[in-house]
Amino acid sequence: KIGLHYNTCSGGTPSRTHEEYYADGTIPWVKTGEIKDNIIIHTDECITEDGVKGSSAKLLPQGAVVMAMYGVNIGMLAYLDSEMTCNQACCVFSDKNEIISRHYLFHYLYSIRDYLLLIGFGAAQQNLSQDLIKKVKIVIPPTELIKKFDEQKEPLYQTIRALMMQNDKLIKQRDMLLPRLMSGKLEV
């Protein structure tokens, strides 16, 4: 079962009534809408250290695998590119025994997403829980096979990460240049 090999936790949402939890925040805070079978390099919102201390949000390690437990992106996965926090709708996996790599876990969870959605429950909307996820059986291949899988996957992961970072730079450049082009301040 997944729970034998991975600890799970979720985060929290700092109270919006405390402006100091968000103002000038530098700690990325993941929401399920940002989990899209991707690598999360940056988030829409950041929180402060006070926001972490004053809520159930936790600092999560770089490289952690995160799953959306409910909402539009239920069952979708992401890697955290740096130390981040998340809200309570996210399930974060942390390795207990280093038998199963994060790449293997990510792809295994991806491969059983339909099953997870089938067993997900909820009155108004479908949702998953940490308890349900921890009880799901996981196929564990021999260690050597997992190592070979990781050797194949890691360069692809690094390439995807580099392309995402390059894409972010291009988006920033576009957003900077487009208003200048539209206003006539910059000519082609």
Question: Each PLM stretch: what is its role?
Answer:
Residues 31-32, 48-110, 119-124, 129-133:
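A short beta-sheet element
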Residues 18, 80, 151:
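Extended, folded domain segments that form the structural surfaces/walls around functional sites
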Residues 3-20, 33-62, 86:
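Sequence-specific dsDNA recognition surfaces
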Residues 1-13, 24, 29, 135, ...:
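Non-catalytic DNA-recognition/assembly elements of restriction-modification systems
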Residues 110-113, 117, 157:
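Short amphipathic alpha-helical signal-transduction/dimerization elements
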Residues 20-21, 38, 63, 124-127, ...:
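Juxtamembrane/interface motifs at transmembrane-helix termini
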Residues 77-78, 102-104, 116-118, 145-149, ...:
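Extended hydrophobic-aromatic, low-complexity segments
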